[in-house]
Swiss-Prot record:
Its EC number is 6.3.2.9. ATP binds at G112, T113, D114, G115, K116, T117, T118. PANTHER family: UDP-N-ACETYLMURAMOYLALANINE--D-GLUTAMATE LIGASE. It comes from Chlorobium chlorochromatii (strain CaD3). One of its GO terms (cellular component) is cytoplasm. GO terms for biological process: cell division; cell wall organization; peptidoglycan biosynthetic process; regulation of cell shape. This is UDP-N-acetylmuramoylalanine--D-glutamate ligase. Pfam families: Mur_ligase_C, Mur_ligase_M, MurD_N. Keywords: ATP-binding, Cell cycle, Cell division, Cell shape, Cell wall biogenesis/degradation, Cytoplasm, Ligase, Nucleotide-binding, Peptidoglycan synthesis.
Amino acid sequence: MDVAGKKVTVLGGGKSGVAAALLLQQLGATVLLSEHGALSSEAMQRLQAAHIAYEANGHSEQIYSADFCVLSPGIPPTAPVVQQMEAHSIPLYSEIEVASCFCKARMVGITGTDGKTTTSTLIHTLCEADGKRHGYRSYSVGNSGIPFSSMVLAMQPNDVAVIELSSYQLERSISFHPQVSLITNITPDHLDRYGQNMQRYAEAKYRIFMNQQAGDTFIYNQDDSMLQAAFGASQIAVPCRSVAFGLEPLTNVQLDKRRVLVNGNMVVVRQNDGALQPIVAVDEVLNRAFRGKHNLSNVLAAVAVGEALGIGSEVMRQALTAFGGVEHRQELVATIDGVEWINDSKATNVNAMRQALEAVPAPMILIAGGRDKGNNYATVSHLIERKVCLLIATGESREKLASFFKGKVPVIAVPTIDEAVAIAHQQAKAGESVLFSPACASFDMFNNFEERGAFFKQCVRQVL
């Protein structure tokens, strides 16, 4: 991508938009950043320091004089400004697409509905450990928080860019070409963006491997029914080596693709000759701070990537045994009077809540709720009825939750998280857990799940 001398519009003034603007200006483009709403003071300071033009609280006609446009992931394809860009025949790219054009490092792309951040963090941990031995650096970028654009020019050819990708980021990634790609799972989420069409959502995820070539590797989860149907049965052609990981029992049809599995208590890699190479014992990597079948699946995914990158088994074992989990993902906040308090604010859909309910031992008090995303709680009803001694429903969706579970488990509905924590503290007994797993978006009261999780932890510490 040649950007020197080009006029570029960046739509959206969040972290990725500002990072893209700074990168493009550094590479010689003339940039206008345009934000429909307000810009943060930090964003304005960074843009002013770099002498980048910007506008906020609306879009002017200037934005349509660009050679191309960088579209922030939160702006949907149906937004009027996007449709106007297309009407003006202005090419639209994601921030990921732009950054990848200037990336010298090896790229690992990770997407999926759940498990992206934990798996990306595991992969980054493996690469950091291997990099210390072999003289390269690992960069964890993308949807996890640090924009790809802000780090890409520092990356060297032997480095590794571990890139977490949402479906939104992949939509406008036209030529993005990771050497290793991974899909953790695909379950219903964000369907409002995709016209309630699950296939359209999946196809956005599948963009991750579309530009891969014969020497590259695509990795998928055989335990996910949608992925197994698409790739295990070869319904969708993949242009590179395709390998799988999984926990469920194998069939002969699956065996030829499964590379990483559990044999007894051991995570193993199946070699080309069928021999099993041990990597790490399950009970060495799973613990109170990092537990559950879903996290074991995340470990298998990371090992599959490590194997594709040529990371040695001993390096992987040492790195995995030292891993302590990721903030806001079944994070053990504190143990108070024999009660474990667990922050799972990242559970923004019902499937993520299900994983937490399966991982945390009964009995528990469950705090759930927020901005509903068309949730169907029937898929977790059996777990809640069996394991939850009290459901505290909070946020905008509290009445929907309370109505659905009325008569199934004891339910209390309160407006706010701090009220929910106070009630849980009064009711919890030694040997129980308090699990905060909202199954909803955070936008009813918070800017993001991180802010929500931090508030929950603050509330917990106040009752210490």
